């Protein structure tokens, strides 16, 4: 579930998703891409549209659409991660109330704010250099919703390190 594809960060997240599929030699199925608008309601509508296809996993471009997706899944009778894996973008402390705990891609918000403030102060102080584009490295926070724990429990002898290597290599 992407964000609005007229917004630069939504395009970047979509491109990252697409590039990851390609890098892993996974098929890109355009009919399984639903554009949302970063609101709960669009995640809910997208959830109903996507879950009818019984996907193995869903990537959602923000936390609010994830809330809507999980509501749709509950109504349909599908369970995360038993029926589908889920990874969301954004991580906030209040997301800890959800079960399963959400696997997220997190931007370094403190670093983003700090670097933005530095650039703004320079600009206010008269710096007329060209605008800069800085790309911050996100962090993948693996929790229950992606299904990793289920994969480990189903792995022969429960060898978590072996299962982790397999997942990271794919």
Which residues does each predicted region cover?
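Bacterial carbohydrate/catabolite-sensing allosteric modules
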Residues: 1-170
């Amino acid at each position: 579930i992407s964000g609005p594809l007229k917004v630069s960060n939504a395009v970047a997240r979509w491109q990252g998703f697409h590039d990851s599929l390609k890098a892993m030699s996974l098929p890109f199925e355009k009919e399984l891409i639903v554009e949302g608008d970063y609101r709960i309601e669009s995640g809910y509508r997208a959830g109903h549209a996507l879950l009818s296809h019984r996907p193995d996993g869903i990537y959602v471009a923000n936390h609010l659409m994830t809330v809507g997706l999980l509501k749709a899944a509950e109504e349909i009778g599908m369970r995360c991660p038993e029926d589908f894996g889920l990874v969301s973008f954004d991580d906030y402390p209040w997301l800890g109330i959800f079960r399963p705990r959400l696997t997220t891609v997190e931007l370094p918000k403190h670093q983003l704010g700090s670097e933005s403030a530095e650039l703004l102060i320079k600009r206010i102080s008269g710096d007329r250099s060209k605008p800069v584009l800085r790309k911050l490295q996100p962090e993948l926070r693996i929790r229950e919703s992606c299904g990793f724990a289920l994969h480990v429990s189903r792995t022969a002898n429960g060898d978590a390190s072996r299962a982790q290597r397999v997942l990271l290599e794919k």
